[in-house]
Amino acid sequence: MEKSTWTTKVGLAQMLKGGVIMDVVTPEQARIAEEAGAVAVMALERVPADIRAQGGVARMSDPELILAIKQAVTIPVMAKARIGHFVEAQVLEAIGVDYIDESEVLTPADEEHHINKHKFRVPFVCGCRNLGEALRRIAEGAAMLRTKGEAGTGNVVEAVRHARAVYSEIRRLQSMNEDELFTYAKQIQAPYELVKQVATEGKLPVVNFAAGGIATPADAALLMQLGVDGIFVGSGIFKSGNPIKRARAIVEATTHYNDPEIIAEVSKGLGEAMVGINIDQIPAEQLMARRGW
């Protein structure tokens, strides 16, 4: 089968705009996510909070689990491959996954190369902490971006940092002349054509979601107000006291992110949020956001 063009894959990712994508580890959780209004689910064996707690090498999930989740829902199913592990990505494409997340939540397989995403029919989503990482991933064929945040912490501070970094750098680009854009492209190691396009249009050529540490409806609305196109929620739903109610609330807050009254209403009586971790208490070698380059 012919490989999809990058433009087609970007169009597929655009269809998720304004929505919430939820991490699920069972078909039952996937059904809960779909009923709550998720636009897609991320099929995993372990949510990031468990990967963080249990340590060891985190790899692609068992294809059998991913297929069981695919059969349980009608919405798109995403799955994660390790950074640089193009064979895991080939397997995920072969079993019919709708989107592949080349994810720093899993243990990187290659410390020098990300996957060449142009070789795949399936759209890829990748994490980024700044505009340089964003444009390098797009150059490799990513059809969708997300903040890296710090997954599995229930702490939104890194996602906020990464979103603000990308958008402030885009605003900076818009004030640069052509010579400055050439220099800037070299500094951030990104193709000049992409840098020029972003400077001209004032936005990324792909959708950019927030991910990492989003635990409450207010967290989701905060990132949406900062300018992201949608929300990934990992451990924040099924590690909380009332997953069904919290899932619905986060979807509502993402849709009505500019309406504090609705956010206040859906935030009532959600039960315990997931237990959070302060970023400065995490040893440097355990920080997931630093994986990838």
Curated annotation (Swiss-Prot):
GO terms for molecular function: pyridoxal 5'-phosphate synthase (glutamine hydrolysing) activity. D-ribose 5-phosphate binds at residues 23, 152, 213, 234-235. Keywords: Lyase, Pyridoxal phosphate, Schiff base. SUPFAM superfamilies: Ribulose-phoshate binding barrel. Pathway: Cofactor biosynthesis; pyridoxal 5'-phosphate biosynthesis. Pfam families: SOR_SNZ. It catalyses: aldehydo-D-ribose 5-phosphate + D-glyceraldehyde 3-phosphate + L-glutamine = pyridoxal 5'-phosphate + L-glutamate + phosphate + 3 H2O + H(+). The keyword Cytoplasm does not apply. CDD domains: pdxS. It is an enzyme of class 4 (lyase). Its EC number is 4.3.3.6. GO terms for biological process: amino acid metabolic process; pyridoxal phosphate biosynthetic process; pyridoxine biosynthetic process. D-glyceraldehyde 3-phosphate binds at residue 164. The active site is at 80 (schiff-base intermediate with d-ribose 5-phosphate). In the presence of PdxT, forms a dodecamer of heterodimers. Belongs to the PdxS/SNZ family. Catalyzes the formation of pyridoxal 5'-phosphate from ribose 5-phosphate (RBP), glyceraldehyde 3-phosphate (G3P) and ammonia. The ammonia is provided by the PdxT subunit. Can also use ribulose 5-phosphate and dihydroxyacetone phosphate as substrates, resulting from enzyme-catalyzed isomerization of RBP and G3P, respectively. PANTHER family: PYRIDOXAL 5'-PHOSPHATE SYNTHASE SUBUNIT SNZ1-RELATED (PTHR31829:SF0). This is Pyridoxal 5'-phosphate synthase subunit PdxS. The gene is pdxS.
